[in-house]
UniProtKB/Swiss-Prot annotation:
It catalyses: [protein]-peptidylproline (omega=180) = [protein]-peptidylproline (omega=0). This is Foldase protein PrsA 1. Its EC number is 5.2.1.8. PANTHER family: FOLDASE PROTEIN PRSA, PEPTIDYLPROLYL ISOMERASE. It is found in: Cell membrane. Residues 303-351 are annotated as: Disordered. InterPro entries: Foldase_PrsA, PPIase_dom_sf, PPIase_PpiC, PrsA_foldase, Trigger_fact/SurA_dom_sf. Its main location: membrane. GO terms for biological process: protein folding. Keywords: Cell membrane, Isomerase, Lipoprotein, Membrane, Palmitate, Rotamase, Signal. Residues 1-22 form the signal peptide.
Length: 351
């Protein structure tokens, strides 16, 4: 069914999560299935399923969900979850119930998944805010294009898009009139305003518009719709570009939002935030069947890093004792010439 496979990219079979959770709260010898001459207990089921890939992912999701609920539970409201739920339901329309069923979800279990995702999202954004530096602001400013006024044509067919582009290239062609006639958007909307950090317009469209001068028209831009998995085709004309101010601090608030949004999409950064939360929760794996579920977060957390740095310092001290002259030479060199890291370190920007 259309869209059903894209309900939640990160969701594993929720039935497995529930089954594993049930195993924690039910006596191991509780019989869940009886048959002639035999029974299946909770323990039987647990041992049979715990090594499967689905159960491994389910346990990982369960751990992360519990940890973030404990640490950030008061940061996400029921209203936020409901809003996200209804937005997804609207996107799927009449196929939403079928999509839920195909993903082994109910409205309530889906809402729990949304809540878990939003808790992690909150933690990632807060971590990104704390790490903002002047250097990052300046880098973001270099690639930033202020507000652009554009006219955009949206089409469903590549051949049609190419044909429309040829019309637009003809001498005396009226872009606005052609756009209103050809675009497939609701209410024939063709005028838009956005900057280079916009997230409500396809990334490739934003990039194309940012590279154009006033009056410039793009080639056909092909974009895969993340909801329908159908390609859309765009042609944009930049009608006006705001002049870029010379001081990056004039855009500080907007640059901050862009930097945080980019970090929030960075999987490496997300993993570091999750690793720190797991460290703080002091998560210990008691069943060796799940020994590797947190492997992707190994050596990323602050505690792990601190332990590693402590070990390195200890080894350096031991080496210094064995060869004091070399140690003194290294210290003198360090004092005279700052490291590259020290030279580039910036104070966090004011929040």
């Amino acid at each position: 069914m259309k869209n059903s496979n894209k309900l939640i990219a990160s969701v594993v079979t929720l039935a497995s999560v529930m089954a594993l959770a049930a195993c924690q709260s039910t006596n191991d010898n509780t019989k869940v299935i009886s048959m002639k001459g035999d029974t299946i207990s909770v323990s039987d089921f647990y041992n049979e399923t715990k090594n499967t890939e689905v159960s491994q992912k389910a346990m990982l999701n369960l751990v992360i969900s519990r940890v973030f609920e404990a640490q950030y539970g008061d940061k996400v409201s029921k209203k936020e979850v409901e809003k996200a739920y209804h937005k997804t339901a609207e996107q799927y329309g009449a196929s939403f119930s079928a999509a839920l069923a195909q993903s082994s979800l109910t409205p309530e279990t889906f809402k729990r998944q949304i809540r878990s995702s939003k808790l992690v999202e909150h933690a990632v954004k807060e971590a990104a805010k704390k790490e903002l530096t002047t250097q990052e602001y300046k880098k973001a400013y270099e690639s930033y294009t202020p507000t652009m006024a554009v006219e955009m044509i949206t089409l469903d067919n590549e051949e049609t898009a190419k044909s429309v582009l040829e019309e637009l290239k003809a001498e005396g062609a009226d872009f606005t009139a052609i756009a209103k006639e050809k675009t497939t958007t609701p209410e024939k909307k063709v005028t838009y305003k956005f900057d280079s950090g916009a997230t409500n317009v396809p990334t490739d469209v934003v990039k194309a518009a940012s590279s154009l001068n006033e009056g410039g028209i793009s080639d056909v831009i092909s974009v895969l719709d993340p909801t329908s998995y159908q390609k859309k085709f765009y042609i944009v004309k930049v009608t006006k570009k705001a002049e870029k101010k010379s001081d990056w601090q004039e855009y500080k608030k907007r640059l901050k939002a862009i930097i945080i949004a980019e970090k929030s999409k960075d999987m490496n950064f997300q993993n570091k935030v999750i690793a720190n939360a797991l460290d703080k929760a002091n998560v210990k794996i008691k069943d060796k069947a799940f020994a590797n579920i947190l492997a992707q977060y190994a050596n990323l957390g602050q505690k792990t890093k601190a332990a590693s740095e402590s070990s390195t310092t200890s080894e350096s001290s031991k080496a210094a004792e064995e060869n004091p002259s070399e140690s003194e030479q290294t210290q003198t060199s360090s004092a005279e010439e700052p490291t590259e890291t020290e030279a580039q370190t910036q104070e966090p920007a004011a929040q």
